[in-house]
Amino acid sequence: MASNVTNKMDPHSVNSRVFIGNLNTLVVKKSDVEAIFSKYGKIAGCSVHKGFAFVQYDKEKNARAAVAGEDGRMIASQVAVINLAAEPKVNRGNAGVKRSAAEMYGSSFDLDYGFQRDYYDGMYSFPARVPPPPPIALAVVPSKRQRISGNTSRRGKSGFNSKSGKRGSSKSGKLKGDDLQAIKQELTQIKQKVDSLLENLEKIEKEQSKQEVEVKNAKSEEEQSSSSMKKDETHVKMESEGGAEDSAEEGDPLDDDDNEDQGDNQLHLIKNNEKDAEEGEDNRDSTNGQDDS
């Protein structure tokens, strides 16, 4: 396993360093890069970053051989951009402008991985991931023109127009026939559903009307029973009042007879008392006469 150091700034290291761009680093790992580039010579260092990688060889000739052999290779479904780090490929926007290694790296600046990443992101324009496939264009069916009825003699070639018209009409007739059949089937299904719904509604209405009639009958029966009960109660009250009056009328003559009997008894007692008084006076008179004699 090679080291991760690929940022040495001495001229020998810079000239023997290979840059791999447009690399799908989500799939390709450090071991994969080493396996691909180790066949060109001994690898002193290898570093993998987001979207690109560096391979540091011991010799410049090995680096140039790797660039010549691997540039444009398909790695993980992406075309890799491979060149020497000291001789980067000029971007299309900067065509014709050459930049030296001193301008790119600096003479006395110690590069780190962050600087390398920012620098090469600006130097090379490549996607970090596999670009999405272009959308599949759906087949567009051209709309058919309606056939204009009229005199065919006005057109150029009547025979050719009639044949093409027949072909177009036959195709459109087939399409229309299929469409009509499908529409008819859908309409029949809809009609069946509507009929079933109407039947259910009629059943519900009939049940509701029956329930209403039953409720009305029950109410009328209750009213009749309550009215009959009231009539019976009034009749009973009237009978009870009439009986009381009759008993009162019957009781009056008895009271009169009792009163008459009591009067007769009193008169009889008075008469007896008078008789007793008279007899007592007579006895007194007789006793007085005897005494005088």
From Swiss-Prot:
Q: What is its main location?
A: nucleus
> Mind listing the UniProt keywords for this protein, alphabetically?
Coiled coil, Nucleus, Ribonucleoprotein, RNA-binding
- Which segments show compositional bias classed as Basic and acidic residues? 206-222, 229-240
Q: Where is the composition biased (Acidic residues)?
A: 242-263
Note the InterPro entries from the entry.
hnRNP_C, Nucleotide-bd_a/b_plait_sf, RBD_domain_sf, RRM_dom, RRM_HNRPC/RALY_subfam
GO CC term, one of those recorded:
ribonucleoprotein complex
Coiled-coil annotation: which residues?
Answer: 177-225
Give the GO molecular function terms. identical protein binding; RNA binding
**What SMART domains does this protein's entry cite?**
RRM (SM00360)
- SUPFAM superfamilies the record matches: RNA-binding domain, RBD (SSF54928)
The residue ranges crossing the membrane are: none
Instruction: Indicate the family of this protein.
Output: Belongs to the RRM HNRPC family. RALY subfamily.
What is the role of the protein in this entry?
May play a role in nucleosome assembly by neutralizing basic proteins such as A and B core hnRNPs.
Give the protein's recorded name. Heterogeneous nuclear ribonucleoprotein C-like 2
Q: Which organism is it from?
A: Homo sapiens (Human)
Lineage, please? Eukaryota, Metazoa, Chordata, Craniata, Vertebrata
